[in-house]
A protein has these predicted regions:
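Transmembrane-helix bundle segments that line or gate the permeation/cavity pathway
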Residues: 148-153, 157, 172-200, 220-246
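Alpha-helical transmembrane segments of multi-pass membrane proteins
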Residues: 94, 125-139, 165-185, 211-219, ...
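Helix-coil boundary and interhelical linker segments in multi-pass alpha-helical membrane proteins
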Residues: 205-212, 394-406, 465-466
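Interfacial segments of multi-pass membrane proteins
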Residues: 70, 200-208, 436-439
Length: 466
């Protein structure tokens, strides 16, 4: 789940439960001598933030400010030390990537891409479904999945109206395909969705492991493609086999504008630099080049390259009202909390108390983790779930002598496998808001895909450890 609004019944208890649990730490002394006072109060802050994040008592972005307020007061860390993670380089990767996405939307390059694919697809209902899912998948790698779903919804409605399909279920399946494609596409790249960005920052901040754009996509891209094809097979099986062929009437593509060409060139150069950064850093002048640096460089040029209207640039600062500034605080708050867990000794204490897990097989523990995360993310924010679970999962990985990076990657991708409910992801919510899909229809297809995703992720885990 990624939308902020929950029922009032959840909000009020969540606020008081978090506050009461936090207050209890002031009246209970730590039983373990290995747990320092700093670690004890970090545990108190973590408890408060996790409860408020999971129940969304107040905005998850506001909750992310708590480390800046409480950690300098309750622990030996000063404000500057706590504030440093709020400027983690991963946050600048997010900002640069999102600014590039805003430019793509501004010149309607994404719509051109969508119509280009549709104008070259087949005439069967299955090929139409596949085309829309591929468009949603590829677009949401770079553009926020909510915008992807909103862009494709009217196009899909138009296509369904012009095909006059004899299969009454086709429109429902097509809209679900858009939602699923948009959600799955976000898994494939670092900038595709918030949990990916947070995880990369978490690994760099706490384990000095720097995951490049290429390294992430090397694992996540094929994995997401397998999930995408599974989603297509699930949905296409419900299409009436006796349906006739249809010709899609699409808007005739005009010649690319100069603005579209300029943004497309910057986009291609940015992707190329991300993919081939390893080769670029062999050049002495570029030896310190990072994915974040590439993203910010691309964003910078979008603000200085003139548009067709010579009085303006491709992007202006007023375009930045679309930037989700709250996510910057959310990443910073999560990274600040994670860093304090590590530096205070709380991480070691948690690890020591999880030693009993070593008696169980890694396969069983990962299976339980994946099942819990996939079904919890149907009702909880996938970002909040990642923020809350990642420090604990890291300690489990260390106890089991497993790669923190590997187990964390499985967790993060599982957090995006939410296909059952309208509240599970923004694309689901957008499609449901069209009024053309019932909850039962979404849940019926979604639970099948959830179960398939469990098997795919476990298979991926087995492949990685081998």
């Amino acid at each position: 789940m990624t939308n902020e609004n929950t029922t009032q019944a959840i909000k009020k208890p969540g606020f008081w439960i978090g506050l009461i649990l936090f207050t209890c730490f002031f009246f209970i002394s730590p039983e373990s001598a290995s747990l320092t006072q700093d670690a004890w109060f970090v545990l108190a802050v973590m408890t408060l933030m996790v409860v408020w994040w999971l129940t969304e008592t107040i905005s998850i972005y506001v909750t992310a400010l708590i480390p800046l307020i409480l950690l300098p007061i309750l622990t030996s860390a000063n404000f500057q030390e706590v504030a440093l993670p709020y400027a983690n380089q991963t946050i600048f990767l997010f900002l640069g990537g999102f600014i590039l996405a805003i430019a793509i939307e501004k010149v309607n390059l994404h719509k051109r891409f969508a119509y280009f694919i549709l104008s070259r697809n087949g005439t069967t209902l299955k090929s139409i479904l596949f085309s829309f899912m591929i468009i949603a998948y590829l677009t949401s790698m770079w553009i926020i999945n909510t915008a992807t779903a909103m862009m494709l919804l009217p196009i899909a409605t138009y296509v369904c109206r012009t095909t006059n399909s004899s299969d009454p279920r086709f429109e429902v399946l097509l809209l679900l395909g858009i939602a699923y494609g948009a959600t799955i596409g976000g898994m494939a790249t670092i900038v595709g969705t918030a949990p990916n960005i947070f995880f990369v920052g978490y690994m760099a901040e706490n384990y000095d492991i720097h995951i490049s754009f290429y390294e992430w996509s090397k694992v996540a891209l094929p994995l997401s493609l397998v999930i995408l094809m599974s989603a297509y097979l699930v949905l296409s099986q419900s299409i009436n086999k006796n349906s006739t062929d249809h010709k899609i009437i699409t808007t005739k593509l005009t010649q690319m504008s100069m603005n579209e060409k300029k943004v497309a060139l910057i986009f291609i150069l940015t992707i190329g630099a991300w993919v081939f950064r390893g080769q670029l850093t062999s050049i002495q002048l570029l030896s310190n080049l990072t994915d974040a640096g590439i993203a910010i460089t691309a964003a910078f040029f979008l603000f200085i390259i003139p548009s067709q209207n010579k009085k303006k640039e491709l992007l202006e600062w007023r375009d930045m009202h679309q930037l989700p500034w709250g996510l910057v605080l959310l990443f910073g708050g999560g990274l600040a909390l994670a860093k304090s867990i590590m530096t205070s000794g709380l991480a070691n204490w948690i690890g020591n108390n999880l030693e009993f897990l070593t008696q169980y097989s890694a396969f069983a523990l990962v299976l339980i983790l994946v099942i819990c995360v996939i079904f919890l993310t149907e009702i909880l924010s996938n970002t909040a779930l990642t923020l809350s679970f990642l420090p604990i999962v890291s300690m489990v990985a260390i106890n089991l002598q497993m790669s923190v990076q590997m187990l964390g990657t499985i967790l993060v991708i599982a957090a995006s496998c939410a296909f059952m409910l309208p509240i599970a992801t923004p694309p689901n919510a957008v499609i449901f808001a069209s009024g053309k899909i019932r909850v039962y229809e979404m849940a019926k297809q979604g639970i099948i895909l959830n179960v398939i995703s469990i098997f795919i992720l476990i298979g991926c885990f087995q492949l990685l450890i081998s």
